[in-house]
Curated annotation (Swiss-Prot):
Species this protein is from: Annulohypoxylon moriforme
TM ranges: none
Function: Transcription factor; part of the gene cluster that mediates the biosynthesis of the phthalide-terpenoid hybrid 11'-O-desmethylfendlerol.
Compartment(s) of residence: Nucleus
Record lineage: Eukaryota, Fungi, Dikarya, Ascomycota, Pezizomycotina
Keyword Nucleus listed: yes
Record keyword Manganese present: no
Domain of life: Eukaryota
Keywords from the UniProt entry: Nucleus
Motif placement: Nuclear localization signal: 24-31
Protein name as catalogued: Transcription factor mfmI
Length: 472
């Protein structure tokens, strides 16, 4: 189980409505084209792979006083770091408000790792190449967006590095609220639609509140976002902004997992008919086996299982072949599977309920969790544990029991759950005659499992339980 845990699902989205000034356009071009059009280069000597040092990413002084080549920062996930001259170039850019350049430097630095940090499946998803530009451009003309990006990015790093968020970001937070209130008075007067960029800022406030464990505030902002979407004409008006829509739904789903509240967008999505049909089932080779294991299970649950199983097969193939799926497919599967599962109701302690919660736990690890910081969902975790305790029986196939326990371990359970989880896993591993990690992998893969997302933590859990085996 992971060591860094926070609640909720903050967003990182942006969209451009105006053209930035020439200096910023020049900066963006250099940022996006970094590493391209270099011509033939000499082969470089192999260097020892350095360990990611996130503290340097979050240190404003580094970004203004020394180039990335002098630190480990350029090795963080992406291979296209911000140019070494970022400090001097920032001094020529006119931002939407007077701010300390060092605070903006952290935002720009984070923009180079944002997708990788927030989407474990990033290497398998085809995001727009212009996303990096869309991160930067609004900083020049939208003051609310500028201040929002500053306080959300800095507080993200504070939590990631186990630092108590300080008061240095408070002025940016209050400035955002002030600007947003003034803007909503103008945009919400009925003469014009609330802009997508304004919706992005409201979503950021909701995500930040969840990050800071302020649920009431997060709910308030999400309710405001729902009103904005209704004023714009519904969720269909965001179809051209798939990335923003993904983040809206991730935040909505994350709140439901954290508190058990009903998602705010369920009624829109579940009543939208054909627009939320299940995707065509992806081809898999294990339908016969699943039909046997899930005999007597609700038909819609079995269909949901097949959709997720096929999606996992597709992602594993993409990871192996180094290809990508459209982000719209990620959005469609996430929405159609997770909102339906949350809307289903079965008897407490029933096999249907156990499978529903198992699929939700698995889906949360695929669609909601982050790469460097694992979300904590106390309500759902307790609900799943209780259902496991009530429902897991000796006549259930041990392989299915193993999958259900491991899914919880890699998605929602924490170190506090090890006391009851590890002995149970030890017993099931013995029943399945598991001796090596590859033995466990084979069983998990026969159900559904994404190595890119689950293998690292899964191996840690296996090693931990194996050590328990030796000491018993």
């Amino acid at each position: 189980m992971a060591t860094t845990q926070v609640s909720g699902m903050p967003f990182v989205v942006s969209t451009s409505l105006e053209k930035p000034d020439p200096n910023l356009r020049k900066f963006i071009r250099k940022h996006v084209m970094m590493g391209k059009n270099r011509g033939k280069t000499r082969p470089t000597k192999k260097r020892e792979k350095k360990v990611l040092d996130l503290s340097e990413v979050a240190n404003p002084a580094i970004h203004l006083t020394k180039p990335p080549a002098a630190s480990n920062v350029s090795l963080i996930v992406t291979r296209r770091p911000i140019p070494p001259r970022v400090g001097s170039e920032l001094s020529t850019v006119h931002f939407a408000d007077d701010v300390n350049l060092s605070t903006v430097a952290v935002v720009l630095r984070f923009s180079s790792i944002a997708k990788q940090a927030l989407f474990p499946l990033e290497t398998c998803i085809s995001f727009d190449k212009g996303d990096k530009k869309q991160w930067i451009e609004p900083l020049a003309f939208d003051a609310a967006y500028l201040h929002t990006m500053i306080f959300t990015t800095h507080d993200y790093f504070n939590l990631l590095l186990h630092r108590t968020p300080g008061g240095e970001t408070s002025p940016h937070f209050f400035k955002t609220i002030q600007i947003l209130r003034e803007r909503l008075v103008l945009e919400g007067n009925g003469r014009s639609k609330v802009s997508i960029l304004t919706a992005s800022v409201v979503l950021a406030l909701a995500g930040h509140a969840l990050l800071m464990n302020e649920y009431a505030s997060a709910r308030h902002h999400m309710e405001g976002l729902r009103k904005i979407i209704d004023l714009r004409g519904g969720i269909s008006t965001f179809k051209g902004s798939s990335k923003l829509l993904i983040e809206i739904l991730r935040c909505d789903l994350g709140m439901a997992f954290y508190t058990g509240s009903k998602p705010l967008f369920s009624d829109i999505l579940l009543s939208s008919g054909p627009s939320l049909l299940y995707p065509e089932p992806f081809p898999t080779s294990s339908h016969c086996k699943i039909d046997q294991l899930l005999e007597g299970i609700n038909d819609e649950l079995v269909t949901t299982w097949r959709v997720m199983e096929g999606f996992c097969s597709l992602i594993n193939l993409a990871a192996k072949s180094k290809t990508r799926i459209p982000k719209e497919m990620f959005l469609d599967v996430m929405a159609s599977v997770m909102y339906r599962l949350l809307n289903m109701e079965f008897d407490t302690g029933s096999m249907n309920e156990l499978i529903r919660l198992g699929l939700l736990a698995f889906s949360s690890s695929v669609f909601l969790q982050w790469k460097y910081m694992r979300m904590s969902y106390p309500h759902f975790s307790a609900l799943y544990e209780d259902c496991l305790m009530r429902t897991m029986v000796s006549n259930m196939p041990p392989q299915l029991q193993l999958w259900l326990l491991m899914v919880g371990a890699v998605s929602v359970f924490t170190k506090a759950d090890e006391e009851w989880l590890r002995p149970w896993l030890h017993q099931i591993m013995n029943s399945c005659e598991i001796e090596l990690w590859t033995d466990m992998q084979d069983i998990l893969d026969s159900f559904m499992w994404i190595g890119l997302v689950h293998d690292e933590l899964g191996k840690e859990i296996f090693d931990s339980v194996s050590l328990l085996t030796i000491t018993i």
